[in-house]
């Protein structure tokens, strides 16, 4: 019998609604792997789910959050080849990752090559896959285009700068002045967060919503694309912002607005998410990507991990480590 520790959202609320339970790690069902987790990402989406503010599908409490994991396969479902045992893997889980053991569909798991650092790989499934989709598939960024990134020092923000640089785009990162040096390490031009008007851009990637979304639309050049992928601003209203995006799209002219949510792609096209993740793992192994880890927090301190991830000064990805 293998015991499991897991973070539980007992009800919606602040960080103190999180607790750590101990139970028996279930044997994996058909088509699934059980992964002994070595690192799990803590995302703004986890915080919004806990607070009852996430705009997408959320399990009813009590549930275990956690969008992404890396770890070692320690058990396999009855129809899964034994060759998976002992393999190091990374996967997008959507929920259930904040635990010592997580259940992962074998079809979603990507194997890690021998030398790859597991903590760096744990930054890929949510932040880097989101960034890849935003740049390649939604905004369809072309080399030489000006791309403006809000929240450039965060986990998705740094991923956007990292991948955008490889695309040959001119990247501009909006961040507090204390984070400008970090933005520059990714080869991007820092933009002061509180400046009155945003620089004009071909593509704007906005995770804040509200007044920020309106400023983003105003900053678009002809033929420009605005992609909203979150509502992190306290004054953002998801229904109002989504309506606004639809209205902007109906205006005459060639500027376009869209909304993107990775969880929708993961449910509709899990094969594509896995293909992108495999490609990112290869690029990480080649030293072309540089994920930034903001903090490593023990699994037994989930409230602290949520506070760190929710802090505007967090730079990069927060990891829970069992």
Feature locations, PLM:
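A glycine-/small-residue-rich N-terminal strand-loop-strand element
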Residues: 70-94
